[in-house]
């Protein structure tokens, strides 16, 4: 089939101006709820493609335009192409090569981490000439993303790949997808209900590794605070679990308090402003997101507490974050790749072909879990090696205590 590869790949409801603002490093998300035609029927896919083609207008942006600031150099640069490997070319379903449409429901696109995930989705789709993707922007809003999933079902997409804004809030939408018989692949953060497959790195073991670096840096004694990701999201829950595991092994570390940083900078500044008044001694800040760590550092500088030597241990895995490690702003950064969308697309296509997912296993939630390999924490010893492999094309903020 000869056609433009992006003709029907649209971001619905995303303004380019919002994206350009987000690439400055102040975005809200990081990382981490109808009936439809038969999943593999040509009628359903054709109606979905037609609906996507007709969906133009105010506030919509072409995928290529949204990805103009992307950093992925090509398919071979993706870190997990050896997981569920799939040959390039048309996808066969029951001996035929029907047009297939994957619906991608993203939390939002106001952070480069989320755009990087889209890059990996698009990279896989472009390898298969009979596969298209319709991408919807949830605007970091549970109601909007719920409506997006319902929209994809109404369009008759063949499968849905979703990265939910919140683990409980998207349960009703996920239930409707499963009830409609549409394969549902969930990325990065889980939905606490049935789904075909959940794909993600272990936030527990990643946070545990970062927390171990913190315990070692503090020689097993000190007072810490924790800035979480969005409360209720599965990455925030799991990163707190990893920290708790490490603290159980380090009785000399005292947790002073914890607060919801929402993955972004501004709430972290407010939290740290308050804590610096309440606690005369803080030895380290354990943050779930780099943005939170940068925000905490700003608050420390404004409070005149730079001389306290407060240490920072964080997560996200951006090139900017790794640079902050190299320059001494952070002492460790959890290595969490957004380039997992290609795995989600491959899994969805395998499910449409009736295949089982290799290495997927039952876990403590309904459905199956494909756990991705752990990546090492980035520390001053290996930061230079990892900077070129981090996501995002933006500079870290200047160290306010330098």
Regions of interest found by a model, annotated:
Residues 159-178, 243, 261-323:
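Hydrophobic alpha-helical
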Residues 52, 56-92, 101-120, 124, ...:
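Extracytoplasmic "Venus flytrap"
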Residues 13, 48, 52-100, 235, ...:
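Hinge/cleft segment of the Venus flytrap/periplasmic-binding protein
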Residues 89, 145, 199-224, 238, ...:
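Hydrophobic alpha-helical segments within soluble ligand-binding/sensing domains
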Residues 23-35, 42-45:
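Bacterial lipoprotein signal-peptidase II cleavage site
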Residues 137, 191-213, 226-230, 258, ...:
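Short beta-strand elements at the ligand-binding edges of bilobed clamshell
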Residues 106, 110, 121, 208-258, ...:
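An alpha-beta-alpha
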Residues 167-205, 223, 318-326, 330, ...:
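Flexible loop/hinge segments that line or gate small-molecule binding clefts
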């Amino acid at each position: 089939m000869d056609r433009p590869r992006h003709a029907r790949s649209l971001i619905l409801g995303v303004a380019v101006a919002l994206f350009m603002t987000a690439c400055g490093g102040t975005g809200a998300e990081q990382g981490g709820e109808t009936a439809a035609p038969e999943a593999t029927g040509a009628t359903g896919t054709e109606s979905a493609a037609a609906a996507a083609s007709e969906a133009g207008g105010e506030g919509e942006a072409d995928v290529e335009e949204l990805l103009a600031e992307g950093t992925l150099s090509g398919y071979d640069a993706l870190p997990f192409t050896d997981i569920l490997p799939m040959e390039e070319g048309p996808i066969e379903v029951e001996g035929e090569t029907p047009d297939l449409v994957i619906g991608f429901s993203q939390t939002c696109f106001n952070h480069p981490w989320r755009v990087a995930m889209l890059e990996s989705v698009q990279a896989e789709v472009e390898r298969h000439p009979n596969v298209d993707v319709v991408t919807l922007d949830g605007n970091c809003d549970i109601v909007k993303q719920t409506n997006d999933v319902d929209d994809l079902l109404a369009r008759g997409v063949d499968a849905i790949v979703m990265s939910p804004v919140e683990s409980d809030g998207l349960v009703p939408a996920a239930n409707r997808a499963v009830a409609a018989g549409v394969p549902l692949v969930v990325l990065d953060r889980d939905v606490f209900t049935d789904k075909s497959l959940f794909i993600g790195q272990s936030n527990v073991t990643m946070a545990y590794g970062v927390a171990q670096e913190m315990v070692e840096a503090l020689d097993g004694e000190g007072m810490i605070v924790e800035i979480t990701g969005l409360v209720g999201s599965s990455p925030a829950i799991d990163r707190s679990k990893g920290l708790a595991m490490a603290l159980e092994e380090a009785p000399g570390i005292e947790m002073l308090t914890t607060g919801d940083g929402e993955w972004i900078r501004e709430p972290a500044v407010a939290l740290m402003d308050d804590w610096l008044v309440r606690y005369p001694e803080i030895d380290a800040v354990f943050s779930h997101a780099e943005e939170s760590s940068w925000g905490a550092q700003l608050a420390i500088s404004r409070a005149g507490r730079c001389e306290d030597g407060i240490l920072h241990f964080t997560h996200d895995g951006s090139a900017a974050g790794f640079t902050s490690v190299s320059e001494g702003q952070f002492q460790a950064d959890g290595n969490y790749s957004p380039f997992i969308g290609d795995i989600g697309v491959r899994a969805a296509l395998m499910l449409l072909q009736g295949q089982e997912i290799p290495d997927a296993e039952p876990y403590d939630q309904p459905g199956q879990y494909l756990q991705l390999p752990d990546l090492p924490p980035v520390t001053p010893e290996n930061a230079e090696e990892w900077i070129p492999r981090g996501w995002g094309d933006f500079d870290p903020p200047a160290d306010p205590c330098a």
